[in-house]
């Protein structure tokens, strides 16, 4: 059983919700990332989503786009991000790590070479924002050969046909985008999201996580009440735009504790 399946099964047996945290690899400096991941896990993160820095992150709002700029300016590339997972695995063999990024850097390395090395480093799954399920047959087959999960996005605008298509292909978890727009958007319609998540869960046994717009205890609880996981990115990443690295790490860890406590109130 994969690390993701094991983690979700354990949480479901405890009637707890998964907290999935997004971190941009190499932001603000490469040496910050791995210690930050360990601290976030200790504070209550269940699954890590590690962003691959890319120069044209079209699905990301300004917070994460700027994080990618900082990481690239600090010299972080795709292979560096994979090596961060490898270093993380020296101390943590249990916490699932999913890479989130864009197709171009993966194509530059080559599908087989990238996936093979990612697996070797301890990566559990991959979400490529600009690779829709209709075009992912070749890449998905390579992931399957290496026992890695392929995670897809669904949105408020997704048709029933698209939902079913993703439900048939996805593994690990499905990422439901709770807002129309880019990451870090401000307003969250919990009732609409709840209805859509119920619909998705009616079509698949794959866990459903919800992200975009979750930034505090109230929104985490609202989404956690209907989804298997809440996915938080911009609320963590934004600290690194304005604070010194050590202060930003401390603020991020405190935010993890706040969200973890909120989700655990749902038990």
Curated annotation (Swiss-Prot):
Protein name per UniProt: Tryptophan synthase alpha chain
Pfam families per UniProt: Trp_syntA (PF00290)
Function description: The alpha subunit is responsible for the aldol cleavage of indoleglycerol phosphate to indole and glyceraldehyde 3-phosphate.
Alphabetical list of InterPro entries matching this protein: Aldolase_TIM, RibuloseP-bd_barrel, Trp_synthase_alpha_AS, Trp_synthase_suA
Keywords: Amino-acid biosynthesis, Aromatic amino acid biosynthesis, Lyase, Tryptophan biosynthesis
Reaction(s) catalysed by this chain's protein: (1S,2R)-1-C-(indol-3-yl)glycerol 3-phosphate + L-serine = D-glyceraldehyde 3-phosphate + L-tryptophan + H2O
CDD domains from the UniProt entry: Tryptophan_synthase_alpha
SUPFAM superfamilies: Ribulose-phoshate binding barrel (SSF51366)
One term of GO molecular function: tryptophan synthase activity
Pathway: Amino-acid biosynthesis; L-tryptophan biosynthesis; L-tryptophan from chorismate: step 5/5
Record-linked HAMAP family: Trp_synth_alpha
Taxonomic superkingdom: Bacteria
EC number of this enzyme: 4.2.1.20
Family the UniProt entry places it in: Belongs to the TrpA family.
Subunit text: Tetramer of two alpha and two beta chains.
């Amino acid at each position: 059983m994969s690390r993701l399946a094991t983690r979700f099964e354990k949480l479901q047996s405890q009637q707890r919700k998964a907290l999935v945290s997004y971190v941009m690899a190499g932001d603000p400096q490469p040496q910050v990332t791995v210690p930050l991941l360990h601290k976030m896990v200790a504070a209550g993160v269940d699954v890590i989503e590690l962003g691959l820095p890319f120069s044209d992150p079209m699905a990301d709002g300004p917070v994460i786009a700027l994080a990618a700029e900082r990481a690239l300016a600090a010299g972080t590339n795709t292979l560096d991000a994979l090596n961060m997972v490898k270093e993380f695995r020296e101390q943590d063999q249990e916490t699932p790590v999913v890479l989130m990024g864009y197709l171009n850097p993966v194509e530059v390395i080559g599908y087989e070479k990238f996936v093979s090395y990612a697996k070797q480093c301890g990566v559990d799954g991959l979400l490529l924002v600009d690779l829709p399920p209709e075009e992912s047959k070749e890449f998905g087959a390579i992931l399957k050969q290496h026992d890695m999960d392929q995670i897809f996005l669904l949105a408020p605008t997704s048709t029933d046909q698209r939902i079913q298509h993703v439900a048939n292909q996805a593994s690990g978890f499905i990422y439901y985008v709770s807002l129309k727009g880019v990451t870090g958007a401000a307003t969250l319609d919990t009732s609409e999201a709840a209805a859509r998540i119920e619909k998705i869960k009616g079509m698949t046994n794959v866990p459903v996580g919800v992200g975009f717009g979750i930034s505090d205890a109230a929104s985490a609880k609202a989404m956690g009440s209907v989804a298997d996981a809440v996915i938080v990115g911009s609320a963590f990443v934004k600290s690194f735009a304005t604070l010194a690295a050590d202060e930003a790490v401390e603020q991020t860890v405190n935010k993890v504790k706040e969200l973890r406590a909120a989700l655990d109130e749902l038990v």
